[in-house]
Amino acid sequence: MNKQQFIDRAEENLLHVYNRFPVVFDHGKGVHLYDTDQVEYLDFASGIGVMAFGYGNEEYENALISQLKEITHTSNLFYHSPMIEAAAKLTKAAGLSKVFFTNSGAEAIEGAIKTAKKYAYLRDGFAGHEIIAMNHSFHGRTVGSLSVTGTDHYREPFLPLMDGVKFATFNDFSSILANATDKTCAIIMEVVQGEGGIYPADADYLKQVREFCDRKDILLIFDEIQCGMGRCGSLYAFQQYGVMPDILTTAKALGGGVPVGAFLLNDKVAKQSLVPGDHGTTYGGNPLCTAAVSQVLDMFENMKLVDHVNEIAPYFIAVLDELVEKYDFVESRRGLGLMQGLVLNIPVGDVVKCALLEHNLVVLSAGGNVLRMLPPLVITKEDVDEFKMKITAVFDSFK
């Protein structure tokens, strides 16, 4: 089939909930993607932050092939070694006590919400507790995760959602205080807001929130589904701030391309929250996906990938800062590590489309006016130079 035939067949059978670009990707190698016409694209989106190693990494692929030949599913009624190994590695890496594996980031958020509510229920002896979330946040599209997503246009068609959620202003501690009540059981936030526009948390703000949560026995939930897994210059972004969460959600690059997420708990919460019968999943923690998690964590360590991010990020950031200086419609840059955004005063959707269809560059948007870059963590200076050439050509067409 040619490209248009693929697209026509997709529209016949797939529910149209994404406005997809007219490109049909066929395979990838390194930091490049190739469509069905064998056109090469530079990928600075990495499947929305998923493909940390890029495409076609043989070590990763061989680990999955090996597990496929052994066993792919048992259900959570039984133990299996890939899940046990992945749990040990992930809890150690994150500095937390227990983990529950899910199939996605949104499922991890659902588990975090349930954990916080159950913790407060056991402590107080009654339900009806509240959660403080952040304006302009994004935590997923399931009912629970959408309930704590602070972006109206995602929420409005599905109201009423879960009640007891209040929204505070990110990086404004006074807004936390204004929304907190005796019923508050948790505060949830992204350490770097992604979909909302690439806003890193302020260090003083996180410390104030942590101290407040400690005083009030409120659980602090960090959503690092997008900003975690090395992207910001540490395995998890919170590790740069010296502020520990009570609950952590993670996904995307955690599995290197297979659908897996997780929520992790500290010891206090793990001992006073979910018990058998409270939470479960048929596929979560299956042997194939947890073998992927284990392999990903091993490769992060063996490749010293976080060190590489810290080495390449300044070079990439310097290129982005040059673009801010060069083009009047590029107002500013913000971000952390290899999670970067350029604030534009021209329609960002037009820029993303032009980059893809005219210059074979895959980038993303965020927050309405931000050009978002989430390149594979393995990018080199040569890849950044290629990005610079392509994005300069894109921006020149908007002068």
Map each language-model feature to its residues.
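Conserved N-terminal phosphate-binding loop of PLP-dependent enzymes in the Aspartate aminotransferase
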Residues: M1-K399
